[in-house]
Amino acid sequence: MPRPSSPRPDAERKSASPLHPRNRHLGRYDFPGLIAGNPELERFVIVNPYGKPSIDFADPLAVKAFNRALLQQFYDVREWNIPEGYLCPPIPGRADYLHYLADLLGASHDGVIPRGTGLRALDVGTGANCIYPLLGHHEYGWRFVGADIDPQSLASAAAILAANPRFAAAIELRRQPDRRHIFEGLVDSAERFDMTLCNPPFHASLDEATRGSRRKWKNLGKLDPGRTLPLLNFGGQGAELHCEGGEAAFLASMAGESRAFATQVFWFTTLVSKASNLPNLQERLKTLGASDIRVVDMAQGQKQSRFVAWTYLDKKQRRAWRRERWSAAVPLGE
C-alpha cells in the first residue's frame, strides 16, 4: 500500500501543462498497472500532498524503479539498469523531444513522418541509460548510433541492448575518442544521418552543478541537513552534467563542428536548457550559413524546455534527400 509522504512536496505531481499529443504519458500515471508489471516499484510508492500515488523523486532508487516500470509497460524494454550515480532521466520529457523531432521531420516531408530503419539518428551523449535510442526505435522504428566519451556509460548501454535483442540490431554504440570534439572523429565521411539529438552538459564545473542543486532543493523545501540528497534528482556523472564553459561553450562547439558535416545531416538538433543561450547560438548558426534555424518549445509539467534545430541543406538538396531516404514514410497518425 502507498505510504503517506511528508508535508513537503517530496513527490512531483503531473501538471496540466501538456505533453506532446503522441506522448504515452499524458494524464496520471497508472501505478497499479506499473506495479503489476514491476512489483519492486511498490515499496517506493507514496501518497503525495494531493492525495495521489507517486514516488519521491529525490530518491534515486525510486526513480530508477519507476523508469524501469515505465520502460517495460510502454516501450517493451524488458531489462534496464544503470550504474549508481549515472543520469536517470525523466522518461516523459525524453519522449517529448523525440515526438517533436518526428514532427519536424514530418513538416519537412509534406506532413508525413518518415519512419522505419531507413532513417538514422545520431544521439550525442547517449549515456549509460541509452534512453533516446530505445524510445526512438520503439516509437518510430529509426536506427540509432549512440555516442559517448565515457567507457562505463557505453558498457552500461551495451548491457541494456544485450538484454533487449529486439533493439540491439537497430542501435549501434560508438565511443568519441576525443572529448574536445563532438562530431569530428565520430562521424565517418561517407555516412549520413537524418537527425542528430543531444542533451548537453548544463554546468561549467562540478562545483557549479553542486551549488545549483542545493538551490533547487532549498527552493523545494528539501534542503534538510539530516538528509543526504543526490547531486541532482536524476543523478549524473561528470560528462553528463558539466563541461568547460558550460552549456554555452558546448553549443558553440557543436554548431562550429556541424558545418563540416553540412551535407551529411538533414537536421542537427540539441536541447537548450538556458533560454539565455539561444540568441548566441542562433547568431552563430546564421554566421555559419545554416539555411533554416528553428526553436521548438516543449513543456513537461511545470518545466519549460526547448530544442534548436538547424540544417545547411538548400531546398534542392532537401528534395533529393527525401526522395532517396524517406520514400517509405508512413502518414501522420498511423
From Swiss-Prot:
This protein's record includes keyword Transport: no
A cellular component annotation (GO) from this entry: cytoplasm
Pfam families to which the protein is assigned, alphabetical: Methyltransf_10
Major localisation: cytoplasm
Highest taxon of source: Bacteria
Entry's localization field: Cytoplasm
GO biological process: rRNA base methylation
EC number annotated for this UniProt entry: 2.1.1.181
Family: Belongs to the methyltransferase superfamily. METTL16/RlmF family.
Function field: Specifically methylates the adenine in position 1618 of 23S rRNA.
Name of protein: Ribosomal RNA large subunit methyltransferase F
